[in-house]
Amino acid sequence: MVVRREKKSRKMRGSRTMGWGIRGQHRDRGSQGGRQIGMHKEKWSWLVKYGKGWYGKHGFRNPTTKLTSAISLRKLNELLESGYIKIKEMDGKKIVDLNELGYNKLLGGGSISIPVTIKVGKATNKAIQKVKEMGGEVILSPTE
């Protein structure tokens, strides 16, 4: 391809269309924007098909809400049996510290098959009862 030494715009002055052929070819829609620009104009058809809920108000996240990271006895039992959670031995007791693992509440769903001492911030009455029936205990130690 031949290198253009002078600008096309400079060479074609006075030629009515300046290299764009028929007059209407250069009268197109201009810049349609980049990423996520013009959703209410140029990209409306895409928005109608894929962008449900693009416009409007959609609530907010309450900054004072405290999120709880809970684990059920069923899930805890699975993690203990698979070896994913290591049991610590201290004074002949098997101890699992859920606060260290990022959980702050123990739920009573399911059952546990290993008698362990569980340290956690909060626990339901049902969970405490089931752990005691198995021969373990629940120590409530708030993290906050």
From Swiss-Prot:
PROSITE patterns associated with the record: RIBOSOMAL_L15
Region (Disordered): 1-35
Keywords per UniProt: Ribonucleoprotein, Ribosomal protein, RNA-binding, rRNA-binding
UniProt entry tagged with the keyword RNA-binding: yes
Gene Ontology cellular-component annotations: cytosolic large ribosomal subunit
Biased composition regions of type Basic residues, renumbered to the chain: 1-14
Subunit annotation: Part of the 50S ribosomal subunit.
Function: Binds to the 23S rRNA.
Annotated protein name in UniProt: Large ribosomal subunit protein uL15
Organism: Saccharolobus solfataricus (strain ATCC 35092 / DSM 1617 / JCM 11322 / P2)
